[in-house]
Structure formats: structure tokens, C-alpha cells
Amino acid sequence: MKKIKDKKNSLGDGIYLKNNKWSFSGDASKNFDKHIIRSVPLYLEGHKMIEDLSRYTLSKKSLCYDIGCSTGTLLNKLAKINKNARFIGIDKEKDMIKIANTKKKFKNISYICNDIMKYRMKKSDLIISYYTAQFMNPKLRQSFFDKVYNSLNWGGMFILFEKVRGSDARFQDIYNNLYYNFKRSQGFTNFEIVNKEKSLVGVMNPFTENANNDFLKRAGFVDIEYIMKEICFSGLVSIK
């Protein structure tokens, strides 16, 4: 089905509906960085937080995974300040991996196009899921967290940033209104906001903060701390 590039199909930033569903390929990959910065509150601040946290867990010959690495922006930042560590970015979208490779600035970064649930991870000291798990099939979510826990070395760190649901309908309504106001403040039109919400139905499946905590605890994590929160977007750190 051919995309029609007009206002009715626009999601903003040169990205258009593709078969009425959000996709990370094509226009989305080419314009991803600009779009995500305008779409997610404190997106770049989250990157800075991860840079700072990486200093506590990465050392010489440490391995770090970025699951759902998209265009590789975060790994370039991490590799710059952790020159003796190794970084592997994993993303199942080949268009994202292609862009990440063209943007790669450091030799200690490598990119792999694969589904994380099919990829055999090595023992590592840091695993990052930056707004990635929310796009996984809910049936696989617990298996994903189990895999992360089992792949970490003792004392290793898992950094998880997610869009989250409100704990009840009242809080969800508040989240929605505050988030839509944020997107309008970033220049998105009402058409684009509604189109994006429709495109994510069945594609993105966020859980509540409590549910994410439960996933982590069932996987084996005990030490869990929230490090960032803005509207319905939160970041936490778990240490094995």
C-alpha cells in the first residue's frame, strides 16, 4: 500500500503513516533522531544520565549492549567516554542499523541487525533498553527481562527507560493530557498527534511502573531505583 504524503497522513518530521501503522523503517529511520527528541520529554537528558551511570559499571574490556540502538546516537556518546570498553548495538530494523553504521565514530562499537530474543548475548557489565521494551510483544516481556538478568555479570547494571501507563484511568487521563500539551509545545499539530496515537495501537504496549518492577523482580533483580521521571516517561536502574 503506497504512502500518501499529505497532512492527513503526517506524523511530523517528514514521517508518514505506512499501512496505518508505525514503522521504524524508511522515513522513520531517516528522521528518527529529530522526531524522538521532540516526542519524548528529557530524551537527551536521559542520554546524559546513562553516560554518567556508565562510569560506575564499565571498565577496561567491559561489554555493553544497547538493545534497540536505533541510529546509534547513544553508543557514540558512551564510546567517547569509555574508550576501553566494547559496545554492541542491536536492532532488528536494517534501516536503523545502516544509519548507525554510517554514523559510527569509534572502533569499539559494532552493530548487529537481529531480534534480541533470537540473539545469543555474552556476559556483560551494562545493558541498556532505551524506550525499546515497550515495543516488544507483551507475551515476550518477561522472557526479555529474564534474558537481560542472565546475561549480566554479577554487579552488572541494567538501565531501562520506558513510556508507562497510569496506575488507574484517572492518572492515565492526566498523563494523556499533559503529554499532548507537551507535544503541542514541541510544534506537533493535532492531526500529527492523533495520527501517531492511532499508528501505535498494537505496536507499542507500555505497562505501569509497578508492572515493570514486577518483571524485573521475577527476573531476579533486587536492587531497583528510579532515576528519572517526566509525565509518563520513566527511567530506572537495576543492579544484579
Where are these regions (language model features)?
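Class I SAM-dependent methyltransferase SAM/SAH-binding core
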Residues: 65, 72-118
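A short glycine-rich, Lys/Arg-flanked "PGG" loop and its adjoining helix->strand segment in the class I
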Residues: 142-154
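Conserved beta-strand signature within the Rossmann-like core of class I S-adenosyl-L-methionine
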Residues: 155-163
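C-terminal alpha-helical "lid/dimerization" subdomain adjacent to the S-adenosyl-L-methionine
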Residues: 163-218
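Conserved alpha-helix/loop element of class I SAM-dependent methyltransferases that forms part
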Residues: 42-60
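A conserved beta-strand element that flanks and buttresses the S-adenosyl-L-methionine
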Residues: 128
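Core SAM-dependent methyltransferase catalytic element
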Residues: 222-240
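N-terminal, positively charged/glycine-rich alpha-helical extensions of SAM-dependent methyltransferases
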Residues: 1-31
